[in-house]
A protein has these predicted regions:
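Conserved structural position within tetratricopeptide repeats
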Residues: 25, 61-62, 93-96, 151-152, ...
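Helix-start (N-cap) detector for alpha-helical repeat units in TPR-like alpha-solenoids
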Residues: 34-35, 68-69, 102-103, 124, ...
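Short Cys/His-rich micro-motifs in 6-15 aa windows
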Residues: 21-30
Length: 224
Protein backbone atom coordinates (compact mmCIF):
# COMPACT_ATOMS: atom_id res chain seq x y z
CA UNK A 1 0.00 0.00 0.00
CA UNK A 2 1.02 3.65 -0.41
CA UNK A 3 1.67 5.90 2.56
CA UNK A 4 -1.05 8.61 2.72
CA UNK A 5 1.57 11.14 3.81
CA UNK A 6 4.45 10.70 1.36
CA UNK A 7 3.10 8.22 -1.22
CA UNK A 8 5.91 5.75 -0.63
CA UNK A 9 5.16 2.02 -0.94
CA UNK A 10 4.76 0.63 2.58
CA UNK A 11 4.25 -2.91 3.83
CA UNK A 12 0.67 -3.62 4.91
CA UNK A 13 2.06 -5.28 8.04
CA UNK A 14 4.01 -2.16 9.07
CA UNK A 15 2.64 0.24 11.69
CA UNK A 16 4.70 3.15 10.39
CA UNK A 17 5.87 4.23 6.96
CA UNK A 18 9.47 3.15 6.38
CA UNK A 19 10.12 6.39 4.51
CA UNK A 20 8.56 9.22 6.56
CA UNK A 21 7.77 7.40 9.83
CA UNK A 22 4.07 8.34 9.58
CA UNK A 23 1.70 6.17 11.65
CA UNK A 24 -0.38 4.17 9.15
CA UNK A 25 -2.42 2.09 11.62
CA UNK A 26 -5.73 3.84 10.96
CA UNK A 27 -5.01 4.14 7.26
CA UNK A 28 -4.57 0.36 7.02
CA UNK A 29 -8.13 -0.02 8.28
CA UNK A 30 -9.36 2.27 5.50
CA UNK A 31 -7.39 0.28 2.93
CA UNK A 32 -8.93 -2.93 4.25
CA UNK A 33 -12.44 -1.49 4.00
CA UNK A 34 -11.65 -0.21 0.51
CA UNK A 35 -10.58 -3.69 -0.56
CA UNK A 36 -13.74 -5.15 0.97
CA UNK A 37 -15.88 -2.78 -1.09
CA UNK A 38 -13.89 -3.71 -4.19
CA UNK A 39 -14.65 -7.39 -3.58
CA UNK A 40 -18.32 -6.52 -3.09
CA UNK A 41 -18.30 -4.65 -6.41
CA UNK A 42 -16.60 -7.57 -8.14
CA UNK A 43 -19.41 -9.87 -7.01
CA UNK A 44 -22.08 -7.39 -8.11
CA UNK A 45 -20.46 -6.97 -11.51
CA UNK A 46 -20.47 -10.75 -12.01
CA UNK A 47 -24.24 -10.89 -11.45
CA UNK A 48 -24.70 -7.82 -13.70
CA UNK A 49 -25.69 -5.45 -10.91
CA UNK A 50 -23.49 -2.82 -12.53
CA UNK A 51 -25.14 0.16 -10.83
CA UNK A 52 -24.56 -1.49 -7.46
CA UNK A 53 -20.96 -2.19 -8.44
CA UNK A 54 -20.44 1.49 -9.30
CA UNK A 55 -21.72 2.57 -5.87
CA UNK A 56 -19.37 0.14 -4.10
CA UNK A 57 -16.40 1.13 -6.26
CA UNK A 58 -16.91 4.85 -5.71
CA UNK A 59 -17.07 4.24 -1.96
CA UNK A 60 -13.93 2.10 -2.20
CA UNK A 61 -12.07 4.90 -3.97
CA UNK A 62 -13.23 7.49 -1.45
CA UNK A 63 -11.49 5.44 1.23
CA UNK A 64 -8.38 4.74 -0.85
CA UNK A 65 -7.78 6.69 -4.06
CA UNK A 66 -4.73 4.51 -4.75
CA UNK A 67 -6.87 1.37 -5.11
CA UNK A 68 -6.12 0.86 -8.80
CA UNK A 69 -7.92 -2.48 -8.88
CA UNK A 70 -11.12 -0.68 -7.90
CA UNK A 71 -10.54 2.15 -10.37
CA UNK A 72 -9.78 -0.25 -13.22
CA UNK A 73 -12.91 -2.25 -12.46
CA UNK A 74 -14.93 0.97 -12.41
CA UNK A 75 -13.61 1.68 -15.90
CA UNK A 76 -14.59 -1.82 -17.04
CA UNK A 77 -18.09 -1.40 -15.62
CA UNK A 78 -18.52 1.91 -17.44
CA UNK A 79 -17.23 0.27 -20.61
CA UNK A 80 -19.71 -2.59 -20.24
CA UNK A 81 -22.51 -0.01 -19.96
CA UNK A 82 -21.36 1.61 -23.20
CA UNK A 83 -19.85 4.68 -21.51
CA UNK A 84 -16.39 4.49 -23.09
CA UNK A 85 -15.47 8.09 -22.27
CA UNK A 86 -15.90 7.56 -18.53
CA UNK A 87 -14.08 4.24 -18.79
CA UNK A 88 -11.05 5.88 -20.38
CA UNK A 89 -11.15 8.63 -17.76
CA UNK A 90 -10.88 6.11 -14.93
CA UNK A 91 -8.04 4.22 -16.62
CA UNK A 92 -6.09 7.43 -17.20
CA UNK A 93 -6.47 8.31 -13.51
CA UNK A 94 -5.43 4.80 -12.56
CA UNK A 95 -2.29 5.14 -14.68
CA UNK A 96 -1.46 8.44 -12.96
CA UNK A 97 -1.63 6.77 -9.53
CA UNK A 98 0.26 3.63 -10.59
CA UNK A 99 2.53 3.97 -13.62
CA UNK A 100 4.02 0.47 -13.55
CA UNK A 101 2.37 -2.96 -13.64
CA UNK A 102 -1.12 -1.56 -14.22
CA UNK A 103 -3.85 -3.34 -16.20
CA UNK A 104 -5.13 0.07 -17.26
CA UNK A 105 -2.31 0.07 -19.85
CA UNK A 106 -3.80 -2.99 -21.52
CA UNK A 107 -7.36 -1.63 -21.49
CA UNK A 108 -6.35 1.71 -22.98
CA UNK A 109 -4.15 0.16 -25.66
CA UNK A 110 -7.04 -2.00 -26.83
CA UNK A 111 -8.81 1.22 -27.78
CA UNK A 112 -5.90 3.47 -28.70
CA UNK A 113 -4.39 0.87 -31.06
CA UNK A 114 -7.70 0.58 -32.88
CA UNK A 115 -8.42 3.89 -34.67
CA UNK A 116 -11.67 2.59 -36.17
CA UNK A 117 -12.93 1.74 -32.67
CA UNK A 118 -12.06 5.21 -31.40
CA UNK A 119 -13.79 6.81 -34.37
CA UNK A 120 -16.83 4.66 -33.68
CA UNK A 121 -16.85 5.73 -30.02
CA UNK A 122 -16.54 9.42 -30.93
CA UNK A 123 -19.35 9.12 -33.47
CA UNK A 124 -21.66 7.41 -30.97
CA UNK A 125 -20.99 10.01 -28.27
CA UNK A 126 -21.61 12.91 -30.68
CA UNK A 127 -24.93 11.40 -31.80
CA UNK A 128 -25.97 10.73 -28.20
CA UNK A 129 -25.11 14.26 -27.04
CA UNK A 130 -26.92 15.76 -30.04
CA UNK A 131 -29.96 13.58 -29.39
CA UNK A 132 -29.96 14.53 -25.71
CA UNK A 133 -29.75 18.24 -26.59
CA UNK A 134 -32.64 17.90 -29.05
CA UNK A 135 -34.75 16.07 -26.47
CA UNK A 136 -34.13 18.83 -23.92
CA UNK A 137 -35.16 21.40 -26.56
CA UNK A 138 -38.40 19.57 -27.27
CA UNK A 139 -37.37 18.36 -30.74
CA UNK A 140 -38.47 14.82 -29.97
CA UNK A 141 -38.61 13.50 -33.54
CA UNK A 142 -35.01 14.53 -34.22
CA UNK A 143 -33.92 13.17 -30.83
CA UNK A 144 -35.67 9.87 -31.53
CA UNK A 145 -33.91 9.50 -34.86
CA UNK A 146 -30.50 10.16 -33.29
CA UNK A 147 -31.02 7.79 -30.38
CA UNK A 148 -32.15 4.99 -32.71
CA UNK A 149 -28.84 5.40 -34.54
CA UNK A 150 -26.93 5.34 -31.26
CA UNK A 151 -28.44 2.11 -29.92
CA UNK A 152 -28.11 0.50 -33.34
CA UNK A 153 -24.39 1.28 -33.34
CA UNK A 154 -23.87 0.51 -29.63
CA UNK A 155 -26.69 -1.63 -28.14
CA UNK A 156 -25.02 -1.83 -24.70
CA UNK A 157 -25.16 1.96 -24.18
CA UNK A 158 -27.52 1.88 -21.21
CA UNK A 159 -28.09 5.64 -20.98
CA UNK A 160 -29.02 5.76 -24.68
CA UNK A 161 -31.47 2.86 -24.32
CA UNK A 162 -33.08 4.66 -21.37
CA UNK A 163 -33.39 7.96 -23.23
CA UNK A 164 -34.81 6.23 -26.29
CA UNK A 165 -37.35 4.47 -24.06
CA UNK A 166 -38.33 7.81 -22.54
CA UNK A 167 -38.87 9.27 -26.01
CA UNK A 168 -41.04 6.32 -26.99
CA UNK A 169 -43.03 6.76 -23.78
CA UNK A 170 -43.50 10.43 -24.63
CA UNK A 171 -44.99 9.34 -27.96
CA UNK A 172 -47.20 6.75 -26.30
CA UNK A 173 -45.37 3.82 -27.89
CA UNK A 174 -45.00 1.83 -24.69
CA UNK A 175 -44.23 -1.45 -26.44
CA UNK A 176 -41.06 -0.09 -28.04
CA UNK A 177 -40.17 1.68 -24.79
CA UNK A 178 -40.42 -1.62 -22.93
CA UNK A 179 -38.12 -3.34 -25.42
CA UNK A 180 -35.45 -0.67 -24.89
CA UNK A 181 -35.76 -0.96 -21.12
CA UNK A 182 -35.50 -4.75 -21.17
CA UNK A 183 -32.32 -4.46 -23.24
CA UNK A 184 -30.92 -1.97 -20.73
CA UNK A 185 -31.89 -4.21 -17.81
CA UNK A 186 -30.11 -7.22 -19.30
CA UNK A 187 -26.91 -5.16 -19.18
CA UNK A 188 -27.47 -3.58 -15.74
CA UNK A 189 -30.11 -5.53 -13.87
CA UNK A 190 -30.74 -3.16 -10.94
CA UNK A 191 -30.40 0.24 -12.59
CA UNK A 192 -32.82 2.50 -10.70
CA UNK A 193 -33.69 4.61 -13.76
CA UNK A 194 -34.59 1.52 -15.78
CA UNK A 195 -36.63 0.09 -12.90
CA UNK A 196 -38.49 3.38 -12.45
CA UNK A 197 -39.42 3.58 -16.13
CA UNK A 198 -40.58 -0.06 -16.10
CA UNK A 199 -42.76 0.69 -13.08
CA UNK A 200 -44.25 3.68 -14.90
CA UNK A 201 -45.19 1.32 -17.73
CA UNK A 202 -46.76 -1.07 -15.23
CA UNK A 203 -44.24 -3.81 -16.02
CA UNK A 204 -42.61 -6.28 -13.66
CA UNK A 205 -39.05 -5.04 -13.03
CA UNK A 206 -38.02 -8.54 -11.89
CA UNK A 207 -38.97 -10.23 -15.18
CA UNK A 208 -35.42 -10.25 -16.56
CA UNK A 209 -34.07 -11.76 -13.34
CA UNK A 210 -36.78 -14.46 -13.43
CA UNK A 211 -36.08 -15.24 -17.09
CA UNK A 212 -32.39 -15.57 -16.30
CA UNK A 213 -33.03 -17.99 -13.43
CA UNK A 214 -35.27 -20.14 -15.65
CA UNK A 215 -32.59 -20.21 -18.35
CA UNK A 216 -29.98 -21.30 -15.78
CA UNK A 217 -32.21 -24.12 -14.56
CA UNK A 218 -32.89 -25.29 -18.11
CA UNK A 219 -29.17 -25.28 -18.90
CA UNK A 220 -28.48 -27.34 -15.77
CA UNK A 221 -31.15 -29.89 -16.73
CA UNK A 222 -29.78 -30.16 -20.28
CA UNK A 223 -26.26 -30.83 -18.96
CA UNK A 224 -27.59 -33.59 -16.73
Amino acid sequence: MKCPNCGNETSFQAKKCQNCNCDVTDYKKLVGRSNGLYNDALYKAKIRDLSGAIVSLKSSLQLNKYNTNARNLLGLVYYEMGDTVRALGEWVLSKNFQEEDNNADYYMKLLQNNPSKLNHVNSVIKKYNYGLAQAKSGNYDVALLQLKKVVSAQPNFVAAQQLLALLYMQQGDNEKAAKCLRKAQKIDINNTTTLRYLAELGLNPSAVRVDREIAKRNNTKNKQ
